[in-house]
């Protein structure tokens, strides 16, 4: 098995080859995912909700992220591993340097941060200059839930769509290696995926992005009745978890997922 790098994802984008990513939080599931076709994993601060049982990602600490990043890396030594910088862990440049370095030492290949304002762009540039690859996150940014007024679709009106597009361009120019685009209309996703040269991974952003990512609990249907409209329970049509992961990868790569019911017009 070969190690997956950001260069591979850039080549996938150039060839218009879709790829599947998934959240992971422990060694056992990470190993299973890697063995069944997943090349990109995210240790997301979503663990605050899916693992810890909180109602948002805000309580997650850097120590939580370091612990779970180490676990996932042990289980999946070949994947491209993204790790979230949690809430208020990159509020200043020096804080961003120290905390990003800690996640990289724990096994992350790329650190992810949310937002696209001028201060975020500056942090992206400074981290990149110091050899820390950055994945950015626009659209619905869960760490901003209290400002956004809940978990709502973003970029529906022209002004907000233009702002998100402009921010995505600025982040790439600042050195961002990847972009996660969450819960935006497919028309905006298509504009962003077309204009950027870096890989764009969508979640609730339609089939036009270069890759797709879902929370592992949603894919396996272990979130009760709270599966988001943009997600799909792949275990329903599978005999076991490995088969469900293989089906997810296959449907992403062939363009079958996400279907029209999984994105916003």
Curated annotation (Swiss-Prot):
One of its GO terms (biological process) is pantothenate biosynthetic process. InterPro entries: Pantoate_hydroxy_MeTrfase, Pyrv/PenolPyrv_kinase-like_dom, Pyrv_kinase-like_dom_sf. Disulfide bonds: none annotated. Its EC number is 2.1.2.11. It is found in: Cytoplasm. 3-methyl-2-oxobutanoate binds at residues 45-46, 84, 112. SUPFAM superfamilies: Phosphoenolpyruvate/pyruvate domain. GO terms for cellular component: cytoplasm. Pathway: Cofactor biosynthesis; (R)-pantothenate biosynthesis; (R)-pantoate from 3-methyl-2-oxobutanoate: step 1/2. One of its GO terms (molecular function) is magnesium ion binding. Its cofactor is Mg(2+). It catalyses: 3-methyl-2-oxobutanoate + (6R)-5,10-methylene-5,6,7,8-tetrahydrofolate + H2O = 2-dehydropantoate + (6S)-5,6,7,8-tetrahydrofolate. Binds 1 Mg(2+) ion per subunit. Keywords: Cytoplasm, Magnesium, Metal-binding, Pantothenate biosynthesis, Transferase. Mg(2+) binds at residues 45, 84, 114. Pfam families: Pantoate_transf. The active site is at 182 (proton acceptor). Catalyzes the reversible reaction in which hydroxymethyl group from 5,10-methylenetetrahydrofolate is transferred onto alpha-ketoisovalerate to form ketopantoate. Homodecamer; pentamer of dimers. Belongs to the PanB family. This is 3-methyl-2-oxobutanoate hydroxymethyltransferase. It comes from Baumannia cicadellinicola subsp. Homalodisca coagulata. The gene is panB.
